[in-house]
Every structure is written in C-alpha cells, then in structure tokens.
Design a protein with these regions (language model features):
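N-terminal leader/targeting segments
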Residues: 9-12, 111
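Cleavable N-terminal signal peptides
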Residues: 9, 20-21
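Bacterial N-terminal signal peptides that target proteins for export
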Residues: 1-9
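Extracellular, repeat-based ectodomains that mediate carbohydrate processing or recognition
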Residues: 22-302
C-alpha cells in the first residue's frame, strides 16, 4: 500500500538559555522526548499558559495510520520541562477521518482554544471545528466539539485570535462544492462557553468570483467586533490586492460589501499582518511585489 512510504517519526523538544546551556536535559546531545509511539507524529503546535507551562499539540497516526487519518494529541510541560500529562500524550480530538491543520491560542485561564479541520466525508470536504480545553486537557465544550462550518465545501487557511471578552474569533477561506474556481471568506465568533455568536455555519465576509484568496487575518476591534483583511485577485489572475472589513459585535459587516480596498496597485500585495492599535483601530502591513522588487507597506484603519 502507498501508506507504507510513511516514515515513523517522534516528537522531541529542546530549550536553550541565552548562553546555550541545555535547560531540560543534562546531556546536550539529547533532547526531551515528548512522544515516541509507533506511527507518525507531525504538525506540531505550541501554546503557553499564563503560569509558564507549555501545551504541545500534534497530529498522531497511532490509531489510524493512513494518509487520511490522524487524531490530535497533546502534552503539557512545566517550566522545568517535566511532562504533566500521561506518557506519549493525551488524546484531545479523535474520530472518523483526519483531524489536522490545528490552530491554537491561550484562553487566558491556563487553558487553550483549538480550531482545526477534519475530513469526515471525503478528501475534498473539510469541515472546521473548535474546542476549548482546561489546564488538565479536559474538553469544556462537550465531547462532540463545536462545528464552525460544515457541508459547504473545503475550509482552509483559518486564522484565530481572542478578544478582550475572552471570545474566540476565527476567519477562514471556503471553496464551495461545485465551484472549484472560486473562493469565499467567512468568519465566526464563539463565546467562552462555546456558543456561536454570529450566523450559523459562518458569517460571509467576501463572496466574489476571485479564484484565489491569500491568508485572511482577524483581530479584535476592542468593542466586541473585529477587523479582517485578506488579498484576492478579483481584478486579475496575477493582480492580488488588499481588502478589509469591519464587523460589529452582533455580526454585521459595517463597510462595503466584499470589503473596502486598502491597496490595489498593479502586481501582488500579499503576506499581510494585522494588529490592534489598542485604541479601537487596526494597523496592517503587507508585501508589495512589483516584478522582481519587494517592498513593505502599511496602513491604519478604524
């Protein structure tokens, strides 16, 4: 079978101080083993809590060793590198089909928010899901998780953040089933109890004929809503421009349909970042590519 080409990996971690002295293992040639079970471990993600501990998450194929399989496992280390959970990690998310492409952030209460994709029906039908765990790795939003979007097509490139109220904010791309040459953007807010706050199956942000969308990003507007930004090529296959939208606390887009243009220069504007200005606005930075010249630009929005 083709799956036999999969190598057997393990997960190791090391931490060095500023003068390159090993902190967790006395032998500088040896790293700290996190998971060494048979089958593959990959797609590692890290998240710290407010007490100096570290959550380590990964996709683990021990129970479903095929290219379409893999569950989410995790380990927690204290600041001295001592594992706090069971050997080779706790099972966090499991089920039929692969659980993958995890995004994780600190929840501000020594736990974590998780958003990931799964493929329950086919290789091309990826749903988007969320969960919150506490400091012991226990699920806080029920065993069935929270479905963010499902049944519409392929979700991808999700980005997450947390607002000042402890709500989870996420944004993602969607390739609709039956329209493979068009990408849309959706977003969602989930409160700390796991209750979806905006439209069921996601709030539509950009519904255009754009073939490609690059890396949507989201940040809190510090008023219960959010700023979002992305690049798309609605104006030409090789002409990616920057657009943005602001969403109110109740899930209403406040600016023009499909976003306002931030930069529409000829060429490609991509690899963007968005930050709060800590005064209700947002600051954007992006790469501007003109043939062989790369430049960095920025803009403030409110």
């Amino acid at each position: 079978m083709k799956y036999k080409s999969y190598s057997l990996w393990g997960i190791f971690i090391f931490l060095y101080s500023s003068i390159i002295i090993p902190q967790w293992v006395s032998d500088p040639a040896t790293n700290l083993a996190i998971c060494t079970v048979e089958q593959t471990q990959r797609e590692t993600r890290l998240c710290k809590d407010d007490a100096g501990n570290i959550f380590i998450f990964w996709r683990d194929y021990r129970n479903e060793p095929t290219i379409f399989g893999g569950d989410l496992y995790a380990q927690k280390l204290d600041m001295c590198g001592v594992p706090l959970w069971q050997s080779n990690g706790n099972s966090i998310i499991s089920g039929f089909g692969g659980q993958f492409d995890l995004k994780v952030i600190n929840d501000g209460e020594q736990g974590a928010y998780l958003v990931w994709r799964t493929s329950p029906n086919s290789f091309q039908d990826y749903s988007l899901n969320a969960q919150r765990i506490n400091n012991n790795g226990n699920k806080l939003w029920g065993s069935s998780n929270v479905t963010i979007q499902s049944g519409l097509g392929t979700t991808l490139n999700q980005s997450i953040t947390m607002n000042e109220d402890g709500d989870l904010l996420t944004i993602w791309q969607l390739g609709l089933t039956g329209t493979p040459n068009s990408m849309d953007i959706y977003t969602q807010k989930i409160n700390s109890n796991g209750v979806v706050q905006w439209n069921s199956n996601g709030l539509a942000i950009c519904l255009t004929s754009a073939i490609s969308i690059l890396g949507p990003k989201i940040i809190s507007d510090q008023n219960g809503g959010a700023y979002v930004c992305w690049s798309d090529n609605r104006n030409g296959l090789s002409n990616f421009d920057i657009y943005a939208q602001r969403i109110s606390s109740n899930g209403t887009p406040l600016w023009s349909v499909n976003g306002i243009p931030i930069c529409t220069k000829t060429g490609t504007q991509g690899t963007k970042h968005i930050f709060s200005d800590n005064n209700g606005g947002a600051i954007l930075f992006w790469e501007d590519i003109q043939e062989t010249t790369y430049s960095i630009y920025g803009q403030k929005i409110d």
